[in-house]
Amino acid sequence: MARTPSSDRPERGRGGERGDRPNRGRGGAEQTPREREESEFVDKLVHINRVAKVVKGGRRFAFAALVVVGDAKGRVGCGSGKAREVPEAIRKATEQAKRNMIKIALREGRTLHHDAYGHFGAGRVILRAAPAGTGIIAGGPMRAVFETMGVQDVVAKCLGTSNPHNMIKATFDALINLASPRHVAAKRGKKVGEIIGRRDGAAAAAAAGV
């Protein structure tokens, strides 16, 4: 039986025809909707420590992890997990953070709409909106929240505690109190332009020292 001439065979590029297939995941399989959703999130490990439980036979040691997860577009959540191994504790904390995510409206996609205050336990936090180019001026645990949320310019300060759990929860308490001009206008029955005009006027007066 005669062989087919090489000139009649279909040409194959480097790596065959696989490069033309979109959404290829690990192992050459297409990414599932869950995998694409998880790839959109940014997670940061804020704190991990070893804990012990006293039982009849002695002490049982485990690890507790605190994780912050966000999509860099205004959504952010925090969670804690405990397990005998560090990776499992981080996985549990990450899953809990994804379930506890909240949506925060950002001004110009980079900062907060207005100043906010929050507290949890002995911790109190102050969040201030900042002009472009300021950057994230905040302590470690709070910085992780803003970075995963997508905030680029903010000034934050924590008072009364150095416990990362209290700092994170106080920060979320402040974020929940934020409201966009559209939400405030709808609540007061006014136009968005009136709310923005008053906000800008108050900011200019504060800058002038009036």
Curated annotation (Swiss-Prot):
A GO term, aspect molecular function: rRNA binding
Region Disordered, residue ranges: 1-40
Keyword rRNA-binding among UniProt keywords: yes
Protein name: Small ribosomal subunit protein uS5
A Pfam family reported for this protein in Swiss-Prot or TrEMBL: Ribosomal_S5_C
Domain of life of the organism encoding this protein: Bacteria
Lineage: Bacteria, Pseudomonadati, Pseudomonadota, Alphaproteobacteria, Rhodospirillales
Gene Ontology CC: small ribosomal subunit
